[in-house]
Amino acid sequence: MPESSLFITFAFSRELAIIMQYFTSSLPNGLRVLFIPSTSPVVYCGYQIAVGSRNEAQGEEGLAHFCEHVTFKGTQKRRSWNIINCLESVGGDLNAFTNKEDTVYYAAVLKEHMPRAIDLLADIVFHSTYPQREIDKEVEVICDEIESYNDSPSELIYDEFENMIFRGHPLGHNILGTAHNVRSFTTADAQRFTSQFYRPQNAVFFIHGNVKFERVLRLLEKATSDLPTTAAPVCTPLTPLNNQTEKRIVDRHTHQAHVITGCKGYAAGSKQRMALYIINNMLGGTGMNARLNVSLRERRGLVYTVESSMVSYGDTGLWCTYLGCDNHDVQRCLRLVRRELNLLMERPLTERQLLAAKKQIKGQIGIARDNRESLTLDMGKSFLHEGQPRDVDDLLCRVDRVTADDILTVAREVFNPEAMSTLIYE
């Protein structure tokens, strides 16, 4: 039995008092395991694999997402129907998603069905056969998914904007790929791609529930004992990110204009990231009291939706604002957005403003961590990429360390007008 490590974190602040316990271990084949105990009868578990659309070679855009879909279509011992029915027949749930750096397969079941979930997940992740007859059907499902995005300008504009920012870089292309690419993929393509990246040393297994960790490890060893111990191949070094900005207007014949303006942000491990996280929440976070919402919607009635967002990757990031408005209000809205950015660049936050921003962030973190599925996925992701689960204690400490000077410095660096790109759908 592999050795395991116990971690207990205590997170205290004026708003929150949280105790979190988790265990980690590694199997002989290199699979890392994260266990978060709870008192709930529901178990969340799955695999987080370090492969996404940024790992695709030129000409195979969409292959990572394609593999995620067809992984459910048959293994050496299960047909597609058996995979679907295995957990759903006992009220469980089986799901998956792909992003630019990860592919995740996960399940939710009552704890008495945990062995069934562990066996099924290992089977589909590591032993899928990708039968061509099933691929031929699933291809059309994926193409319909692609078309649904093309029919939604408020979603499509994010993909096109990211392609502008990361032009010529694997992070720039759409996760779904194109219908042309998807229709060209075969069983051999899926087998080649997954054999490269779906390996124990390139993944973590996470589980959250009222179960015995020793039993989890025994079940995992049994389910993965036949897997190779070789590491996933090192990706070809990526081309340097371009630093060009762009202003682009696209005629989409939409009823309203869709507008995104933004720039590169910070990588996941950047010390400046938390300051930008606080700034982003102040500007266009989920609260109705966000500065952009107050300025553009509450005071002037120019928009229904205005928001800002940020995403961090291993080596870079992205920050942007999005809004939808009447075509004749586009330039006015952009000026108002710019005014809010300038205020953050020119005026340091007062102590009261900074404390209020931190209080809001801490409350949001506490509520988000009450969602056990979200908590488990987030801790699994940080365990995969950072080598240690990112817990509440760490997040709260990072929030507390941010100063008004940090906010001012980051705002001046990120919101430089010369670094901004803009994309408009009319």
Predicted regions and their residues:
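Non-catalytic terminal extensions that flank enzyme cores
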Residues: 17-32, 37
